[in-house]
């Protein structure tokens, strides 16, 4: 028996987003006051991300008898990330040149007030490649979890899982315990997901109430160019990769629609991380590959952020009348490939990464970021959506490369569409 449509999670989230837009538009002060609802939901999800990554990675690695396999999976994932990220950067650059969203502004950078972007620039100046790599190593095992840093948690999990695998059968009881604890944490995720509509409502009401739909009008061409380019990237680039791997990108998007709507409402791809990992396992990807690829992808495979970065840089150059040479554009690409690795799945990280890129390329004034500050929140939804789709596709691809993908289950699950989602939602209700 099918559930009434109003009890389906993605319908509830869609309705909540719509109501949030109305509230923020007509009663902006009330909309801004709804911010704690969105923040609270994201904090609930972040509370559980660390333990879930730890349990998933540890049990996955502990189940691998060959530690070379861990390195092989990680190496293939990083290779995939670099290739696809480069495509994303190039597509963002090409689209900005082709559609010219910044031409016609004729803005003098000296007239721009940079006070609003000082917090982003100061954070960006603190980032460097060496510091980023050193930051991956936590001060203590516990600080990785208390800080909620995904890469630090992943590093701790890799060491812990490798140690359990080395000990072998004597550590079997520990592995079994972690497997059971993992089930508890995923059950908590199902409970938290029930309030996703409230979180999406609060976050969207705040966004519209604070920034207003009117702030979109002057920069509609840039927003339209970015959204159009992201759609082209997902449909054609990720679509071609998916087709080569043996699945349809549109069916895959339909399969993770609940996660996408949560991301749309909260502007944070981290909000859907636990559910995405569970969905990918149900899709036929091995637990070990999911545990390694998804968390790593949240810092190394941000396709939406990459498209945004090169497009935003060219937009600022066009708006301020700066002509960039081929060498300067290649420099921007190289710098962006490094700075994008410092971005995480949280709101605002893409803007900080853009500041880091501009700081290394003095030809383009950092003050130009003021032009897109007001609309960055509206663009962050598209960044986060593209990022999560890209990470999902990457996990399926690496699983296929490792022969760790149950293709029959993949085909069956995608063909069934929403049936598995209904079962997942029912499981969450039986608490």
Curated annotation (Swiss-Prot):
It is a multi-pass membrane protein. Pfam families: SDF. It comes from the Bacteria. Keywords: Cell inner membrane, Cell membrane, Membrane, Symport, Transmembrane, Transmembrane helix, Transport. GO terms for cellular component: plasma membrane. Its main location: membrane. The keyword Transport applies. Gene3D superfamilies: Sodium:dicarboxylate symporter. InterPro entries: C4_dicarb_transport, Na-dicarboxylate_symporter, Na-dicarboxylate_symporter_CS, Na:dicarbo_symporter_sf. The chain crosses the membrane at residues 8-28, 44-64, 78-98, 148-168, 188-208, 222-242, 307-327, 355-375. GO terms for molecular function: fumarate transmembrane transporter activity; malate:proton symporter activity; succinate transmembrane transporter activity. GO terms for biological process: L-aspartate transmembrane transport. It is found in: Cell inner membrane. Belongs to the dicarboxylate/amino acid:cation symporter (DAACS) (TC 2.A.23) family. Responsible for the transport of dicarboxylates such as succinate, fumarate, and malate from the periplasm across the membrane. This is C4-dicarboxylate transport protein. It comes from Cupriavidus pinatubonensis (strain JMP 134 / LMG 1197) (Cupriavidus necator (strain JMP 134)). The gene is dctA.
């Amino acid at each position: 028996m099918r559930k009434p449509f109003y009890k389906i999670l993605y319908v509830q989230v869609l309705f909540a987003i719509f109501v949030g837009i109305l509230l923020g538009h007509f009663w902006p002060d009330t909309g801004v006051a709804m911010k704690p609802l969105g923040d609270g939901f994201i904090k609930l999800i972040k509370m559980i991300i660390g333990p879930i990554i730890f349990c998933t990675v540890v049990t996955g690695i502990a189940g691998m008898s060959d530690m070379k396999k861990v390195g092989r999976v990680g190496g293939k994932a990083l290779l995939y990330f670099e290739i696809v990220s480069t495509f994303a950067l190039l597509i963002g650059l090409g689209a900005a040149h082709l559609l010219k969203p910044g031409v016609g502004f004729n803005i003098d950078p000296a007239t721009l007030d940079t006070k609003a972007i000082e917090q982003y620039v100061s954070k960006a100046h603190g980032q460097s490649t060496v510091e980023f790599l050193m930051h991956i190593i936590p001060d203590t095992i516990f600080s990785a979890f208390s800080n909620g840093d995904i890469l630090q948690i992943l590093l701790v999990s890799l060491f812990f899982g490798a140690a359990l695998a080395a000990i072998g059968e004597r550590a079997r009881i520990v592995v079994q315990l972690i497997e059971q604890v993992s089930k508890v944490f995923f059950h908590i995720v199902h409970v938290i997901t029930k309030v996703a509509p409230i979180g999406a409502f609060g976050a969207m009401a705040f966004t519209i109430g604070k920034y207003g739909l009117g702030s979109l009008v002057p920069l509609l061409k840039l927003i339209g160019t970015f959204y159009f380019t992201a759609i082209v990237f997902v449909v054609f680039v990720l679509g071609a990769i998916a087709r080569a791997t043996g699945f349809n990108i549109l069916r895959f998007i339909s399969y993770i629609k609940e996660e996408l709507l949560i991301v749309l409402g909260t502007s944070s791809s981290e909000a859907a991380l636990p559910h995405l990992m569970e969905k990918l396992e149900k899709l036929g990807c091995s637990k070990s590959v999911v545990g390694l690829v998804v968390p790593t992808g949240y810092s190394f495979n941000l396709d939406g952020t990459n498209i945004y970065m090169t497009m935003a840089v060219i937009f600022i150059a066009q708006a301020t009348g700066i002509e960039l040479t081929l060498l300067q554009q290649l420099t921007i690409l190289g710098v962006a490939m490094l700075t994008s690795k410092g971005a995480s799945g949280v709101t605002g990280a893409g803007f900080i990464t853009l500041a880091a890129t501009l700081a290394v390329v003095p030809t383009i004034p950092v003050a130009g970021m003021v032009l897109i500050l007001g609309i960055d929140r509206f663009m962050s939804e598209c960044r986060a959506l593209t990022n999560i789709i890209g990470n999902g596709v990457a996990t399926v691809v690496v699983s296929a490369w490792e022969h760790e993908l149950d293709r029959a289950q993949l085909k069956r699950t995608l063909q069934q569409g929403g049936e598995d989602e209904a079962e997942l939602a029912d499981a969450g209700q039986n608490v």
